[in-house]
Amino acid sequence: MTQQRTLKNTIRATGVGLHSGDKVYMTLRPAPVDHGVVFRRVDLEPVVEVPADAELVTETTLCTGLTCNGAKIQTVEHLMSALAGLGVDNVIVELSSAELPIMDGSSGPFVFLLQSAGIVEQSKPKRFIRITQTVEVRDGDKVARFEPYEGYKLGFTIEFNHPMIPAKQSRQEIEFSTSAYVKEISRARTFGFMRDLEYMRERNLGLGGSMDNAIVLDEFRVLNEDGLRYTNEFVRHKILDAIGDLYLAGGAILGAYEGFKSGHALNNKLVRALLADQAAWEWVSFPEGTEQPPVTYASPVYA
């Protein structure tokens, strides 16, 4: 039996937007069953709600952004990843600005926030999206693919011509569970290259970026004094992003995901292609008295 989950208590955090550089106040609130993840722009009059829905994705350049009724919500992927990692189905995310706080560039601070708020089970079974047929999307040599699988498995390969990202550290696989997510993925930070800084600044991107919330590389090395948290932190962060992007499908995935040089755009294209092909997936749940789901979530955290 696996039930839907929400937060036990309301919790707040403050930070800056990675791309906007704006200070943002964020409040996470419990939500009822079947509510899903919904963002709320409380700085707008009237308040605008933006559901966490792959069909509402309008921005995929260096982040995943949603637009609904003229209101934007940007850089949702790290919080969505933490929610997926801890199995939280229903939550209201109130924001005082258009962009979520970047925190330390990983999903670790969001995991801590969610655990601090407490996670409780609700009265209805959790709904999973089970992959029943292979779905693949491409963009040049980039590939993202779903395949049927008993569980949730993610594999990712990156290719960067950089001495700090050798081929042997460019591949990672994870058999998804809450404990594997928290230990192996959640602390991996976003990263960027000094050579891309001018491109980003011209587009008003990365204005809140610093070595406090990203790994920064020049042509030869990592510039952060403390170095890396994992030897292959870069590809682990790509899995962190993918878990968040895929959670915009509207339910927890049961299947195998494979990404080769994929990013936010291709991940979103994959989710849209999946949802458009009704023969490729089905809703499943595991109510009391039935089989256990092939994915392990941590026991609820009662704060």
UniProtKB/Swiss-Prot annotation:
EC number: 3.5.1.108
Active-site residue list: H264 (proton donor)
Gene Ontology terms: cellular component: membrane
Residues binding Zn(2+): H78, H237, D241
Reactions that this protein is recorded to catalyse: a UDP-3-O-[(3R)-3-hydroxyacyl]-N-acetyl-alpha-D-glucosamine + H2O = a UDP-3-O-[(3R)-3-hydroxyacyl]-alpha-D-glucosamine + acetate
Top enzyme class: hydrolase
KW Iron (keyword) present: no
Cofactor(s) the protein requires to work: Zn(2+)
PANTHER family in UniProt: UDP-3-O-ACYL-N-ACETYLGLUCOSAMINE DEACETYLASE 1, MITOCHONDRIAL-RELATED
Similarity comment: family membership: Belongs to the LpxC family.
UniProt xrefs under NCBIfam families: lpxC
Protein's name according to its UniProt entry: UDP-3-O-acyl-N-acetylglucosamine deacetylase
